Amino acid sequence: MSQELDYPSSLSAPTSRKAETFSYLPKMTTDQIKAQVEYIISKGWNPAIEHSEPENAFSYYWYMWKLPMFGDTDANVVLAEVDACIKANPNNHVRLIGYDNYAQSQGANMLVKRGDM
């Protein structure tokens, strides 16, 4: 039987915190983020962008960047909005969400930029 290992993550140590899908993997490249956006669009989900200060990310609501991109089918438009959000909020966490209208929930949720801690 394999031994269970403890992961050294703590809310008191900001640099050890993990958040959202893919946070245990290396940072995604622009092409990998674009592939995720294309997946969200291919499922018919509505992309949305949110951001939050790192110190508030785990205990408060995140700010929505504009409105969800209802019916947007161009990944480059979504990526341009992600870049605009990052430029306007350079120290914040930025996440990409795919809202599933049918299930009335989030189909995808991932950090695309980790804020300075």
From Swiss-Prot:
Gene3D superfamilies: Ribulose bisphosphate carboxylase, small subunit. SMART domains: RuBisCO_small (SM00961). It holds the Pfam family RuBisCO_small. CDD domains: RuBisCO_small. One of its GO terms (biological process) is reductive pentose-phosphate cycle. One of its GO terms (molecular function) is ribulose-bisphosphate carboxylase activity. InterPro entries: RuBisCO_ssu, RuBisCO_ssu_dom, RuBisCO_ssu_sf. It comes from the Bacteria. Induction: Both mRNA and protein accumulate at 2% and 0.03% CO(2), but not at 15% or 0.15% CO(2) (at protein level). The keyword Magnesium does not apply. Keywords: Calvin cycle, Carbon dioxide fixation. Heterohexadecamer of 8 large and 8 small subunits. RuBisCO catalyzes two reactions: the carboxylation of D-ribulose 1,5-bisphosphate, the primary event in carbon dioxide fixation, as well as the oxidative fragmentation of the pentose substrate. Both reactions occur simultaneously and in competition at the same active site. Although the small subunit is not catalytic it is essential for maximal activity. This is Ribulose bisphosphate carboxylase small subunit 1. It comes from Hydrogenovibrio marinus.
